[in-house]
Amino acid sequence: MIRVLLIDDHEMVRMGLAAFLEAQPDIEVIGEASDGSEGVRLAVELSPDVILMDLVMEGMDGIEATKQICRELSDPKIIVLTSFIDDDKVYPVIEAGALSYLLKTSKAAEIADAIRAASKGEPKLESKVAGKVLSRLRHSGENALPHESLTKRELEILCLIAEGKTNKEIGEELFITIKTVKTHITNILSKLDVSDRTQAAVYAHRNHLVN
């Protein structure tokens, strides 16, 4: 049986969820909490397999409750079940440790399936939320600094260039041939989008890559 804890400040929501879930052959509701602080206490006390978490509640909200539960328990499986898909709700609770994010407009069977998936460590995201997360990942990639694409070896060579080392000195320090050094430098210049080693050195200092 999958042991589930419900955390929601609306009694009717908890009653409806509990009635549906208890009718499932493989799911058991082991506790209900009406706010975040009570939810944290019950989560620690009962160690449920899966937690259904509302976000907007009086007192401690779902984001803070998720943070605290993730600090107290090892790898808790938290499914957010809410009416909100605002950025200031979605990202903080996922970053806090929530595994899945569903809307209260989801079909009952979808919630049950998400619970079963969560018990195996498999996430389920409402399609609009998945779109938001993917968009954010794409944008974070677009905003990445050029040197973040350098390999460890290329970063080493960039730092040595910034220290004023010649190709020969770099090769001797890293035990590689001058030809290999030149190949790495060509790649470095391309990735940093600079035209020569002087500009590469300036970039390294500007981005605090060398002391």
UniProtKB/Swiss-Prot annotation:
It is found in: Cytoplasm. Residues 3-119 form the Response regulatory domain. It holds the Pfam family Response_reg. CDD domains: LuxR_C_like, REC_NarL-like. One of its GO terms (cellular component) is cytoplasm. Induction: Autoregulated. Induced by antibiotics (vancomycin, bacitracin, nisin and ramoplanin), cationic antimicrobial peptides (human LL-37 and porcine PG-1), Triton X-100 and severe secretion stress. Keywords: Activator, Cytoplasm, DNA-binding, Phosphoprotein, Transcription, Transcription regulation, Two-component regulatory system. One of its GO terms (biological process) is regulation of DNA-templated transcription. Its main location: cytoplasm. Member of the two-component regulatory system LiaS/LiaR probably involved in response to a subset of cell wall-active antibiotics that interfere with the lipid II cycle in the cytoplasmic membrane (bacitracin, nisin, ramoplanin and vancomycin). Also seems to be involved in response to cationic antimicrobial peptides and secretion stress. LiaR regulates the transcription of the liaIHGFSR operon. This is Transcriptional regulatory protein LiaR. It comes from Bacillus subtilis (strain 168). The lineage of its organism: Bacteria, Bacillati, Bacillota, Bacilli, Bacillales. The gene is liaR.
